[in-house]
Amino acid sequence: MIMAGKVMKKLTVSVASLALCALLLACPALAETSTRGAVTKLLIPRFVSLKTSEGNVRRGPSLTHRIDWILKLRNMPLQVVAEHGHWRKVLDFEGAGGWIHYSLLSGARTVMIKKDTVDILDRPLPDSAINARLQRNVLAWLSACELEWCEITADGYKGWAPKAALWGVSAEELFE
């Protein structure tokens, strides 16, 4: 009888695990939003920006780890993919990653233009008037995002850009 109880528990756990896996596969957005950082309890992954004009990116989460490179673009968007104590593992817009101290990061939202050229439009409509044309790797401030469009400001120009042309905002993100 004890054996049957253990088998039943294992079967119940296995069925529950399969159901959870099926749910997460059917709803990728749910899988992404359900991950929280162990330290901050904020969503992982999430986007932040570099607070300073220089930031050391290290091989691991401590001062004893070697510096792999130095970020030199203030307000550069970064994606936090892990947390460990006062350290955040980040990826830049080219996919390079490493660990950076949390004090060098800001919650201010910025994006990089990831297409060769992007028209910044007056309204979030494809046939709207063009306010500016931005080139690849231009840094812009993020103000708001709708389903397919984000309002950005770069070099004094403000307008709407297709979300797919920006790095620093996730596809499902909406905010004002």
Residue ranges of predicted features:
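Short, low-complexity, intrinsically disordered N-terminal modules
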Residues: 1-4, 36
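Beta-strand-rich domains and repeat architectures in extracellular enzymes and scaffolds
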Residues: 66-67
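Residue-identity detector for glutamine
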Residues: 9-11, 79, 135
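Intrinsically disordered, low-complexity polar regions and short flexible loop motifs
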Residues: 62
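SH3-family beta-barrel domains
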Residues: 31-59, 70-74, 81-84, 88-96, ...
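N-terminal signal peptide c-region/cleavage motif recognized by signal peptidases
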Residues: 26-28
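Bacterial N-terminal signal peptides that target proteins for export
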Residues: 4-19
